[in-house]
Amino acid sequence: METVTSLVFIVNLLIIFTSVVNQARGDTCIDGLGYCNNCDERCKAKHGPSSESSCDRSVGVPLCKCYYECESPPSPPAPPKKCDGGAGICSQRCQGQCCDMNCAQKYIGGHGFCNTLGTFSFCQCEYPC
């Protein structure tokens, strides 16, 4: 009696574990569906007509395993493109913070910095486009 109780306990744990956890092997996933009654029908109903099922008898009690094609994760969104623009000349009256403020007013989401080329200092802006 104790052996049967232990076996039932182990089988129940296995059923719970396999029904909750999907194991990914390459592009094929496995879903444990419990006992083998109507295994193929339940597999196809849950994961589509291309899924395949089998009854695993390695633990003593036949358990249904459903093999199906895993969904690929969504690709991450592309980073926003950055565009360049200008907001005039940097001077003693309008330096870094002033340039940044001018770019923010001129371009949505814009930021600016003073960029010196030779003897001239231009207010250069970067903004999402």
Swiss-Prot record:
Belongs to the DEFL family. Coiled coil: none annotated. Residues 1-26 form the signal peptide. Keywords: Antimicrobial, Disulfide bond, Fungicide, Plant defense, Secreted, Signal. The gene is PDF3.2. GO terms for cellular component: extracellular region. Confers broad-spectrum resistance to pathogens. This is Defensin-like protein 182. It comes from the Eukaryota. One of its GO terms (biological process) is defense response to fungus. Disulfide bonds join C29-C70, C36-C55, C39-C64, C43-C66, C83-C129, C94-C114, C99-C123, C103-C125. It is found in: Secreted.
